[in-house]
């Protein structure tokens, strides 16, 4: 969906929650390399290294603080779109704060389902979305009712099995 939007000259920004860190494989995450090659597609993350729920040496407070920071950043980006003129093409190198056509907030539903951010605040974010913005929320194993009630489009990608369940680590090109 995001690459389709970029292909039509729209600006897209990916804000990832739950993923982050320095000096890790996540610094060279494949999607970041691909995004960097696409004009008009930008990204940032506000996650903590490791994945919430796994033994990564962090606690819920650290993950929650990062997730709440990500939600606050999402609010800023949504607000920036409210006043942006998105009817005409604009500089592909402009920062996301100048407004984007599509904002993808990766893993925000997972963060809400795990109690790292307040689900009501996520719902309020969706309700505050200006008409000129395509807002994409991902993550979670349970779709909150408000998503279905407020969304124009709902799709689902679900895990049937995962290599980590068999003790395999993350695989380059597949998971990062």
Give the role of each language-model region:
Residues 12, 135, 154:
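Hydrophobic anchor at the start of a short beta-strand
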Residues 14-16, 103-108, 138:
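Short beta-strands and strand-loop turn motifs
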Residues 18-21, 49-51, 109-110, 141-144, ...:
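Conserved nucleotide-binding/hydrolysis micro-motifs of P-loop NTPases
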Residues 53-131:
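Phosphate-binding/switch loop-helix module in NTP-utilizing enzymes
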Residues 127-145:
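Sensor-1/coupling segment of RecA-like P-loop NTPase cores
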Residues 140-176:
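Phosphate-binding/switch region of NTP-binding enzymes
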């Amino acid at each position: 969906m995001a690459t389709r939007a970029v292909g039509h000259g729209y600006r897209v920004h990916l804000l990832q929650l739950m993923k982050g860190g320095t000096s890790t494989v996540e610094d060279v995450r494949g999607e970041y390399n691909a995004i960097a090659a696409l004009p008009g597609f930008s990204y940032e993350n506000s996650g903590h290294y490791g994945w919430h729920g796994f033994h990564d040496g962090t606690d819920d407070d650290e993950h929650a603080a990062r997730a709440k920071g990500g939600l606050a950043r999402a609010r800023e980006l949504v607000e920036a779109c409210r006043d942006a003129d998105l009817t005409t093409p604009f500089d592909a190198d402009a920062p996301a704060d100048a407004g984007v056509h599509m904002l993808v907030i990766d893993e925000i539903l997972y963060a809400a389902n795990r109690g790292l951010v307040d689900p009501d605040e996520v719902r309020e974010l969706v309700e505050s979305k200006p008409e000129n913005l395509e807002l994409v929320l991902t993550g979670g194993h349970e779709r909150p009712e408000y998503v279905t009630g407020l969304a124009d489009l709902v799709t689902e990608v679900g895990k049937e099995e995962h290599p980590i369940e068999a003790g395999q680590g993350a695989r380059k090109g597949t998971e990062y």
